[in-house]
Amino acid sequence: MAKGQSLQDPFLNALRRERVPVSIYLVNGIKLQGQIESFDQFVILLKNTVSQMVYKHAISTVVPSRPVSHHSNNAGGGASNNYHHGSNVQGSTAQQDSEETE
């Protein structure tokens, strides 16, 4: 599980540290919005008008409102410049479509 944490933790920590507004999509389709206040191995504390504890197993996607650099130990390499929300092109297209309609 340490390998999975090595991606999650720097990404979530950058979102928390920079107070980036995020949209969190749950596996049941519900969209939550706010800022990541804190997180641990199992939950994310999301703050908006109220704080909500969201279990990670219920999360499908975390979408930042703007790009963040989450590879702090990367010396300017290409990985920190590649901004992806998901593992496929279709997911990125869906996000762009939703941004255009807002």
From Swiss-Prot:
Top-level division of the source organism's lineage: Bacteria
Keywords carried by this UniProt record: RNA-binding, Stress response
Any one GO cellular component localisation term in the record: cytosol
Listed SUPFAM superfamilies: Sm-like ribonucleoproteins (SSF50182)
Chain spans, region Disordered: 63-102
UniProt keyword DNA damage present: no
GO BP terms, alphabetized: regulation of DNA-templated transcription; regulation of RNA stability; regulation of translation, ncRNA-mediated
Any one Gene Ontology molecular-function term assigned to this protein's record: RNA binding
Compositional bias segments (type: Low complexity): 70-88
Entry similarity comment: Belongs to the Hfq family.
Assembly description: Homohexamer.
Function of the molecule: RNA chaperone that binds small regulatory RNA (sRNAs) and mRNAs to facilitate mRNA translational regulation in response to envelope stress, environmental stress and changes in metabolite concentrations. Also binds with high specificity to tRNAs.
Entry protein name: RNA-binding protein Hfq
Originating species: Salmonella gallinarum (strain 287/91 / NCTC 13346)
